[in-house]
Curated annotation (Swiss-Prot):
UniProt binding sites for substrate: 10-11, 24, 32-34, 121-125
One Pfam entry name: Macro
EC code: 3.1.1.106
Annotated keywords: Hydrolase, Plasmid
GO molecular function annotations of the record: O-acetyl-ADP-ribose deacetylase activity; purine nucleoside binding; ribonuclease inhibitor activity
Protein's UniProt keywords contain Hydrolase: yes
Coiled coil residues, start to end: none
SUPFAM superfamilies hit by this protein: Macro domain-like (SSF52949)
Catalytic site positions: 34
Protein's job: Deacetylates O-acetyl-ADP ribose to yield ADP-ribose and free acetate. Down-regulates ribonuclease 3 (RNase III) activity. Acts by interacting directly with the region of the ribonuclease that is required for dimerization/activation.
This protein's record includes keyword Hydrolase: yes
UniProt xrefs under HAMAP family: YmdB
Designated name of the protein: O-acetyl-ADP-ribose deacetylase 2
């Protein structure tokens, strides 16, 4: 059974145990996916993010933290900070790999079986879409092989270009 599914749509409407939020380092909400998740999940997500911020000062690039999901169709939101693309010579690939590995570490720790990822860093952060998709799939396949309890990973693409890229790379 193929455990990776590619979906074109809004991640806030996808039912899974955990959804990944591409946050900023403050964890206080923002634009794009981050803003959509905070709006759809309600104030409980921001309150939990503020508590994390009080304890550890936010979240660094490549790291991840977990909160409840509020009114989203999920149990958890895993917040991570993706890298900004510079020129490919400033560890951007390694940082993006760390994003996925940090998310999967929390998935394993919490016994999560289904998780939904948006496209990470390919919007305003400028990461080349094909490069980001290849990195994502490489790490996801590795993590699925390492963690046999993962049943399903949804790759939720807001735009057709990322959706088509994932489909091509998976086939």
């Amino acid at each position: 059974m193929n455990k990776i599914t590619v979906i074109q749509g809004d991640i806030t409407n996808i039912a899974s145990e955990a959804i990944i939020n591409v946050a900023n380092s403050s964890l206080l909400g923002g634009g794009g996916v981050d803003g959509a998740i905070h709006r759809a999940g309600g104030p409980v997500i921001l309150a939990e993010c503020q508590a994390i911020r009080s304890r550890q000062g936010g979240c660094k690039v490549g790291e991840a933290v977990i909160t409840g999901a509020g009114t989203l169709p999920a149990d958890y939101v895993i917040h991570t900070v993706g890298p900004r693309w510079s020129d490919g010579r400033h560890n951007e690939d390694t940082q993006l790999k760390s994003v996925y590995l940090s998310c999967f570490k929390l998935v394993g720790h919490h016994g999560i079986k289904t998780v939904s990822f948006p496209n990470i860093s390919t919007g305003i952060y400028g990461f080349p879409k094909k490069r980001a998709a290849a990195i994502a799939l490489d790490v996801i396949k590795h993590c699925i092989a390492e963690n046999r309890t993962i049943e399903k990973v949804n790759l939720v693409c807001f735009d057709a270009e990322n959706y088509d890229l994932y489909l091509k790379l998976l086939n």
